[in-house]
Amino acid sequence: MVLISTPPPAYAHNRKTSQEKKRRDEINAKIKELQLLIQNESDNEKMTQGDVLNRAVEVVSRMETESPGPSSNPNRKGFFDGFRSIESLTYSFIKSLGVNSDVCQDFVQRAKQFFDRERSSLLSTVSGKSKRRSESEILHSSMSYRSQSSSPSTSESGITIDRKEVKKNREQDRRDRQGEAFDALKNFIIENKLMTSHQVEKMQRLNTLDIIIAYIQNKKHNFVSRSDQEQSLYAHAIAEGKKTAKNIAFQFFKSDRHLVVRCADLEKFFEFSLSPKPLFGFPSMPIPIPPPSFPIFPFRPFPFFPMPMAPMATSPKSQQSPSYSLDSPPPSSDTSSSSIETPSTPNENSNSNPKASRKSKLFRPWE
C-alpha cells in the first residue's frame, strides 16, 4: 500500500481557485473603501475600479502638495480644508439643480477645472515629482477607452472579430489600466518615503491599498494640537479658505449665463449648510404653553353673551310653614274656596291698608 503524500490535482486546483477568489474579494473591498474616502473629491456617481485608482493617485498627489510631510502647518492645513469643503458643497448644489445628467456632468466638470486652476495659483510650492494628470487628459483617455470598447471591432477587410476576442481585449485593457494605477501608487509611496523601494517591490496590491488608505485618512485628520494658538490659527485659516472658495464659486456661476440666476440660491445653500438654522417661513418648534393662571375675571369664550351674576348673600328668612289655624273650623268640601290662609301677624294687619284687608278676606258661609 502506497501512501499519497501530495493532494490530488483536482483538490489543489480548487484550493488555488478559492484562494484567488478570496484575494480578489479582499482587493475589491479595499477599492470600495478607497472610493468612499475620495467620493467627495470625485464628480462621478458611478466609478469603475480603474477610475477609483486613478482618482486616488490624483488625491494623494494633491494632498501632499497642499500639506507636505507627515505634519501640517495649521495655516496651510486649515485654509485648504475650508477651501475643499466649499468646493464639495458647490458640486452638491449643481447636482441638486435637477438638470439633465449630461448638462449636470458638464457643469461639474467645468467647475472642477475652475477650482483646480485657482487652487494651483494659490499653492506656494508645487511638487515636480508628483505631477498629476489634468482633468482634460483623464476625460479624453476615458472617453477614448469607452469609444474603443463600445464601437464594433472590425478588421481592415471588414470581417467582424469574434465577440470572445473583443471581450478578451477589453479585459486586458482593464487590467493594464489598473496595473498602471497601482504602479503610480507605488511610485508615490517610494517618493514620499512611506516605505523603502525594496519593500515596495515585494508588496502586493492589497498592502498598497492599505498604505494609501491610511495615508488619506491621516492627511484628512492629521491636525491634532493642544496649543490654543495653533487651534486659533487653524480655525482662522478654515474661515479664510471658505471665504476664498466662495468667491471662486460665485465667479464660476457668474461666468455662465445659465447659472448666473442661481447665485442667490447658492449663497443661501452655503449659509444653511455651514450654519444650519430654521429659515423664515419654515415650521419651527411650538411655543411652550404658559402655566395656568387664575385671573380675576374668568375667560369668556363668547363675549357678547351676558355672564350670570353670582348670587348675593342675604339674611336667612324666618322659616314659617303655612298651617291650618287651630281655631278655624275644618275645611269645606267646596272646591271653589280654599281653606289655606296666609299667616299674618297682628302688627302686619294693623299697618296694612283696610281696603287690601277686605280684598284678602275670604268668604266663609259658616262664620
Swiss-Prot record:
Example GO molecular function: RNA polymerase II cis-regulatory region sequence-specific DNA binding
Subcellular location: Nucleus
Stretches with biased composition (Pro residues): 1-10
GO cellular component: nucleus
Region feature (Helix-loop-helix motif 1): 25-63
Region entry Basic motif 2, spans: 162-175
Extent of Basic residues compositional bias: 356-367
SUPFAM superfamilies (UniProt xref): HLH, helix-loop-helix DNA-binding domain (SSF47459)
Phenotypic effect of disruption: RNAi-mediated knockdown causes the formation of misshapen heads as well as ectopic V6 postdeirids.
Name used for this protein in its record: Regulator of fusion ref-1
Taxonomic source organism: Caenorhabditis elegans
Source organism phylogeny: Eukaryota, Metazoa, Ecdysozoa, Nematoda, Chromadorea
Gene of this entry: ref-1
